[in-house]
């Protein structure tokens, strides 16, 4: 598994790269994904997240996490030796940190939850 992390705005990401990779790996293992996957994780500021949420979901406000699935981890038509591009997760650390106390979480714990939430969306879960 590889996780490509971008943080162009140099935001406080709340989690380090090693923890991000660990969390993604735990989710993949729990869901029975045994093949090689690539995940993209981007940290964006609140304004950019607002724009993305409006553009892609038609919702004119910011949000904490967005996910965009590419290849399905369970697509049997993709050769087993090929790396799957699982998709993109976008996190807004400012939004996550602001909402965390309302859920009784630390900012880092809330970010962990949002990363798991995003991973589950990449694996086909919806709410």
Model features per residue range: what roles?
Residues 1-112, 120-127:
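An acidic/histidine-cluster motif and surrounding catalytic segment
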